[in-house]
Amino acid sequence: MLLKKILKQTMKELKRQLRKQIREEKKLHTADVLKEHSSILLKQIEEHQRFIAARTILMYHSLSDEVQTHAFVEKWHTSKKILLPIVQGDILILRHYKGKEFMQVGAFGIEEPVGNEFTDYDEIELGIIPGIAFDRQGNRLGRGKGYYDKLLPLLHTYNIGICYRFQALEEIPAEPFDRSMDEVWTEEGRWNKINEK
């Protein structure tokens, strides 16, 4: 029992240090460079067969330290059903993005869509998922709140993690409840090993 507790604390500390390291690394890149890298990466996603085929997609409305998705979401919301996650308590709920004019500032100062909760999870064909870091096995390091670890098991969707190249690592600490991605992409291309579903 004591060993399990020590291992859990060690894992928590490793993840905390890794998040700090990635934040420091991000400071070495200008906003213009990150914007350009976001565009390059999202162009690859647009050309991905899973994206082309999908009609309903789980996306995210980016924070300043994430691959920038605002223009991408706006571009595609009229031809595909784009769902955005909303923080509600300690979970994420989903809402349909219908345009900039239907957004409001919610938890953590994040803009989020207004409207009803989307619950038809079987309709979602693709998830485009952010992360602090990803590794070659598709493991994801989030912000530490477990939001996506709770949401993703409810969905039966193919998930693509997206991040900047400096966030793509050989290996990150992962626990059994951490949800891995089917694919991981950076501005330089696919990062993780090929293991198609």
Question: Language-model features: where?
Answer:
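Short linear sequence motifs
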Residues: 44, 140-141
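Glycine-rich, N-terminal phosphate-binding loop of Rossmann-like dinucleotide-binding domains
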Residues: 61, 131, 188
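Short, solvent-exposed loop/turn segments at secondary-structure junctions
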Residues: 64, 89, 133-134, 167
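Short secondary-structure transition/capping segments
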Residues: 103-107, 130-140
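N-terminal active-site beta-alpha-beta segment that forms phosphate/nucleotide-binding
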Residues: 2, 6-122
